[in-house]
Curated annotation (Swiss-Prot):
Monomer. Binds 30S ribosomal subunits, but not 50S ribosomal subunits or 70S ribosomes. It is found in: Cytoplasm. This is Ribosome-binding factor A. It comes from Rhodococcus erythropolis (strain PR4 / NBRC 100887). One of its GO terms (biological process) is maturation of SSU-rRNA. Residues 118-128, 137-146 have a biased composition (Basic and acidic residues). Pfam families: RBFA. One of several proteins that assist in the late maturation steps of the functional core of the 30S ribosomal subunit. Associates with free 30S ribosomal subunits (but not with 30S subunits that are part of 70S ribosomes or polysomes). Required for efficient processing of 16S rRNA. May interact with the 5'-terminal helix region of 16S rRNA.
């Protein structure tokens, strides 16, 4: 076991090395739109999991996650050697690439929030012209007792 702070530092360094290598040294066109989002290292520093996202070639085009996964799998050996040279640890961790689902989850949450806002707007629009079911003012003020009310003919005091 190793210090968790050291594992976090190594994970951050591995993510930086892999991202730089993908951008500048690996010429695979399948990796052109790959972004490294996170890296986790096991406590024994033997395995590293690299999370990535793939953006579409255009804004409205779907990303090709399968091609990016195949490109990363093919470049795994080169990337591991770059990590070994860049980190200086005794044992170079094995790299595992996992497609990150955070952007998809965030997009789904944004869609749910947009639907909830539309439903709230619809309720607010219906509320604008609504009339109460009973009296217009359900909180009527209580009657104030006056002198005339006290001397009503129904209730007379005996003299």
């Amino acid at each position: 076991m190793v210090d968790p702070a050291r594992a976090r530092k190594l994970a951050k360094r591995i993510g930086t090395i892999v991202a730089t290598a993908i951008d500048h040294e690996i010429k695979d066109p399948r990796l052109a739109f790959v972004t490294i989002t996170d890296t986790k290292v096991t406590n024994d520093l033997h395995d590293a999991t690299v999370y990535y996202t793939v953006m579409g070639e255009k804004v409205d085009s779907a990303p090709d996650v399968e091609a990016a996964a195949a490109g990363l799998e093919k470049a795994k050996g080169v990337l591991r050697s770059k990590v070994g040279a860049g980190t200086g640890v005794r044992f170079t961790p094995t790299l595992t690439f996992v497609a990150d689902t955070v952007p998809d989850t965030a997009r789904h949450m944004e869609e749910l929030l947009a639907r909830a806002k539309a439903a709230d707007d619809e309720v607010a629009k219906a509320r604008e012209n609504a009339q109460p079911a009973g009296d217009a003012d359900p909180y009527k003020e209580p009657r104030v007792a006056s002198d005339e009310d006290e001397a009503s003919p129904d209730v007379r005091e005996a003299d």
